[in-house]
Amino acid sequence: MSYDRRRFLQLAGFGLGAATVSSMLGSCATRSTTKESPEFWKVGNFLPVDRETAATNLRVEGAIPPELNGLYVRNGPNDWQGSTEHFFLGDGMLHGVRLEQGRAQWYRARYVQTPILYKNPFMLLGPLMPEHNMSNVSLIQHGGRLLSLGEAGWPFEIDPDDLSTRQVFDFGGKLNTAMTAHPKIDPHTGMMHFFGYNVFRPYLTYHQADATGELVKSLPLETDGPAMMHDFAMTEHHVIFMELPVVFSMSKALTLDPFPFVWDADAVCRMGVLPKDGVAADMQWFDIPTCFIFHTMNAYEAGDSVIVDAARYDALW
């Protein structure tokens, strides 16, 4: 059965002021149920940071090359409550170090100031309201902006001087889908290539933003159904999408399941190759053995072939 966005909101019990749909991100792994094996994201080096912090004029052991200047910053989920069901969940926290002329000028840990900061992560609206995402996966610098990215939603612009959040960024109102947390920048043109997936048609949209950050192309693409797409690949002339058998489950979503996707071994498993300057009809799909892929590492062209290097799972569950 096909559902559009309005019908889904009605079935999920949404009103104008309601926000109670489950997250598009939940447990992708089996939870530990023994005291001897606590969830690894709650202990040790993965233990959540309990507050934002800042320090200046940091002590350096050894020497930092004076030519190494700039900002090193990372993003990741920080479960301030310490109760999340999966390590993918947790408000996005940025950790950054500013290096200048052999000195470590400052370190800061700052939350991405999203509309759902300090709220239950299972209330993430994802593709339904793209600004309501935890923005906790990665960052990219493009078009003079530093952007914090999440699994399903819009980016947030970050101030590189202090890691504060400037604004939600939707490319001047042009972006009408979520944005992947793994965009690719063409080193020859400066063009940023990315996609957004959705649980409603169009299930997949391919985007291009030029070197200045202007969104110049948004191309809806036909897929078999709503599938989870975390990453994609890019070569000099092509982009490669992966439609894999982790698919959206309306029945799970309506019961507020924290992860309304299921493994369906009978679903399509294929890669789609599209010329960067192509139209939807130019997509070529190639069936592959049943598997799931979170991340690609590299892609390139060799004669008439397109080669993709990726981490492959025989099954997600």
Residue ranges and their predicted role:
Residues 266-317:
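A conserved active-site cap/scaffold subdomain adjacent to cofactor or substrate pockets
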Residues 201-207, 249-251, 268-270, 316-317:
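Structural motif
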